């Protein structure tokens, strides 16, 4: 009986840890609104890659289409927002693009990342220089 109560207490206390806080998770390509505004019909794949980065889904069956996917999970219920942005090519040049992304949140996400996840750089200047 005592062991059963101990097991139940441990199970309940560890199960409650996940309810308190879930860290927001951002994955995929974070496309900036300024980059989308710079897209133009007739640009090459190299120019698009410089603006938006490498596509998240390289599809050999649709070589004339680049898909950029990003996801954001922010609440405790693990609700995930998925955004897809697609660039279409013909003869290696941009024809059109469509989709959605996180345009209003890109600057906010970039600024809040160090607060949420900590700094990635060393604080000691000697370590920053590689010494």
Curated annotation (Swiss-Prot):
It is a lipid-anchor. It comes from the Bacteria. GO terms for molecular function: protein-macromolecule adaptor activity. The keyword Lipoprotein applies. Keywords: Cell outer membrane, Lipoprotein, Membrane, Palmitate, Signal. GO terms for cellular component: Bam protein complex. GO terms for biological process: Gram-negative-bacterium-type cell outer membrane assembly; protein insertion into membrane. It is found in: Cell outer membrane. Its main location: membrane. InterPro entries: BamE (IPR026592), BamE-like (IPR037873), BamE_dom (IPR007450). A lipid is attached at residue 17 (N-palmitoyl cysteine). Residues 1-16 form the signal peptide. Gene3D superfamilies: 3.30.1450.10. Part of the outer membrane protein assembly complex, which is involved in assembly and insertion of beta-barrel proteins into the outer membrane. Part of the Bam complex. This is Outer membrane protein assembly factor BamE. The gene is bamE.
């Amino acid at each position: 009986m005592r062991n059963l109560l101990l097991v139940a207490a441990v199970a309940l206390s560890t199960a409650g840890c996940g309810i308190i806080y879930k860290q927001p998770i951002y994955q995929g390509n974070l496309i900036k609104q300024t980059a989308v505004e710079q897209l133009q019909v007739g640009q090459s794949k190299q120019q698009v890659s410089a603006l938006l980065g490498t596509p998240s889904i390289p599809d050999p069956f649709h070589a004339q289409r680049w898909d950029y996917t990003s996801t954001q999970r922010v609440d405790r219920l693990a609700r995930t927002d998925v955004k897809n942005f697609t660039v279409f090519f013909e003869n290696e040049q941009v024809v059109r693009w469509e989709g959605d992304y996180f345009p209003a949140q890109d600057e906010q996400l970039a600024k809040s990342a160090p607060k949420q996840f900590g700094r990635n750089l060393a604080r000691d200047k000697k370590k920053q220089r590689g010494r």
